[in-house]
């Protein structure tokens, strides 16, 4: 077995990719650092893509050379045995350019995104027209920072510009300010321009499900640590695990099923039909579920999804009915919003197109800010863009890269997004936060701390017990001292076996207890 598992495997050598030098000195905003690994062989080393070149994320694993797996113990485990140096862990890394590149200096606003998408022109003229007689009330010019008013030469946010023209002064995203600012000439509203940008094929592609097709139907990376090697294969889904990660001493005889394929309550996999919980993603037998007849379901929630217990119902209802898309005002002119791709596919029902367009537009801005901070991160085996799929909460037929449970928290001031964090709320026990980043121009100003305080307050409102993060070894002390995180205790380590949490090579998981 040792001979087979080592055949074709080459020595991996890791090259350190430098972390961001612009960390918040005052709050020590931790920056996640990944390693760029290259597999060495007798073949020529493939060229590394220029950081400024747009890479093409491959969604079909079958396009890569065939990946033979060595299985043992009646096909219960798989061993990576690849000859091609472009496959495997070499694809997980940060391709960073110069941190002072122009895209990092652009304000993270919806207007800046519209300019970059060529939906509107920078310095293009906009106006507000009277609803009574159709006369022009105010004129302005589109800037990345906002709208330059022609009468007072002040740069205003779209909300402020609309209020300046005599409209409502509310900054609430549910107030149709963008719908009443028109582009001169075409007379299209700013809202129509945002909708047009979202409907562009490139933006629509960002929201697609990642269906991975391959000759081997099982994942090549462990769902718990994301590393290959000798893997236990679930007999019901694509998931694979290391024995050590699952705390299994011997390979199970007969059929073996992962935690996501067995009943959450009885731990069995049988012929009885099992439902999948809309919130935590775990399966369960109706007969095992307590108090099912006592539940009250909100029929306005799309798909009328079932839940495994009352705790998941409470978390889901609070998220989808009171938190997603709602702007929360903070001190000193800041606000924060919890975003998620708002469509029927992902179980969030929004009956107002205006709010949906605003949320989706902010997600587009948030993704670009996050990639400016971390670079483009690709999954080792499937080649998908991890950050993009996390921000857009894209689903997949591979559990390890199924990110449909993610939410994005954004911190804003003066119409600009200054900090972004990605969260996956599994249930009342565990929430993970694999990414958080501040805009380049707003670092060393405590932005991550502001957003972290808001996030933790909301998690306490949801009665969440623990917040889990992956950190590089170099940043663990910063997380501990500045944000109150600690190493995983034995109880949490056992709990995480039953969760699909995003993990990176060489990262260290930390936890913060939110509720005593």
Please place each PLM-identified region on the residue numbering.
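PHD-type zinc finger and closely related Cys/His-rich zinc-binding mini-domains in nuclear regulators
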Residues: 105-108, 184-185, 189-360
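Conserved beta-strand elements of beta-rich interaction domains across eukaryotes
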Residues: 154, 168, 238-239, 263, ...
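A conserved beta-strand-loop-helix scaffold within acyl/acetyltransferase catalytic domains
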Residues: 355-441
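Conserved GNAT acetyl-CoA-binding A-motif
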Residues: 457-473
């Amino acid at each position: 077995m040792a001979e087979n598992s080592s055949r074709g495997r080459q020595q991996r050598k890791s090259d350190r990719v430098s972390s961001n030098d612009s960390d918040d000195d005052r709050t020590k905003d931790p920056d996640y650092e990944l390693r760029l690994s290259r597999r060495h062989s007798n073949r020529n080393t493939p060229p590394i893509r220029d950081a400024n070149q747009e890479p093409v994320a491959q969604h079909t694993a079958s396009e890569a050379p065939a990946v033979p797996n060595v299985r043992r113990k009646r096909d219960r485990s798989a061993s990576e045995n690849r000859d091609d140096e472009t496959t495997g862990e070499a694809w997980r890394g940060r391709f960073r350019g110069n941190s002072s590149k122009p895209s990092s200096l652009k304000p993270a606003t919806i207007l800046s995104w519209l300019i970059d998408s060529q939906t509107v022109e920078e310095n293009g003229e906009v106006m507000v027209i009277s609803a009574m007689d159709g006369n022009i009330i105010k004129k302005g010019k589109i800037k990345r920072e906002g709208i330059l008013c022609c009468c007072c030469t002040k740069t205003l946010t779209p909300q402020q510009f609309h209020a300046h023209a005599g409209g409502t002064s509310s900054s609430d995203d549910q107030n149709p300010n963008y719908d009443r600012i028109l582009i001169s000439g075409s007379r299209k509203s700013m809202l129509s321009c945002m909708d047009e940008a979202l409907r562009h094929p490139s933006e629509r592609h960002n929201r697609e499900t990642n269906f991975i097709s391959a000759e081997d139907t099982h994942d090549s990376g462990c769902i718990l640590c994301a590393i290959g090697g000798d893997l236990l294969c679930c007999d019901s889904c694509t998931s694979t695990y290391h024995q050590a990660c699952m705390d299994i001493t011997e390979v199970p005889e007969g059929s073996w099923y992962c935690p996501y394929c067995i009943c959450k309550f009885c731990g069995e996999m049988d012929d009885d039909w099992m439902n999948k919980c809309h919130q935590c993603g775990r399966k369960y037998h109706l007969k095992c579920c307590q108090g099912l007849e006592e539940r009250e379901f909100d029929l306005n929630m799309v798909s009328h999804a079932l839940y495994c217990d009352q705790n998941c119902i409470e978390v889901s209802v609070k998220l989808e009915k009171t938190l997603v898309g709602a702007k929360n005002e903070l001190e000193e002119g800041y606000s924060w919003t919890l975003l998620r791709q708002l469509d029927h596919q992902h179980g969030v029902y929004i009956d107002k197109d205006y709010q949906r367009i605003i949320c989706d537009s902010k997600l587009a801005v948030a993704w670009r800010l996050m990639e400016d901070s971390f670079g483009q991160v690709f999954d080792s085996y499937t080649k998908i863009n991890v950050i993009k799929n996390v921000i857009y909460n894209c689903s997949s037929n591979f559990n390890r890269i199924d990110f449909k449970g993610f939410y994005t928290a954004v911190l804003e001031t003066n119409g600009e997004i200054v900090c972004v964090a990605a969260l996956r709320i599994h249930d009342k026990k565990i929430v993970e936060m694999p990414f958080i980043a501040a805009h380049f121009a707003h670092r060393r100003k405590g932005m991550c701390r502001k957003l972290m305080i808001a996030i933790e307050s909301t998690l306490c409102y949801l009665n969440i017990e623990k917040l889990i993060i992956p950190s590089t070894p170099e940043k663990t002390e910063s997380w501990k001292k500045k944000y109150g995180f600690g190493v995983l205790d034995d109880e949490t380590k056992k709990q995480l076996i039953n969760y699909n949490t995003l993990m990176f090579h060489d990262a260290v998981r930390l936890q913060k207890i939110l509720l005593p």
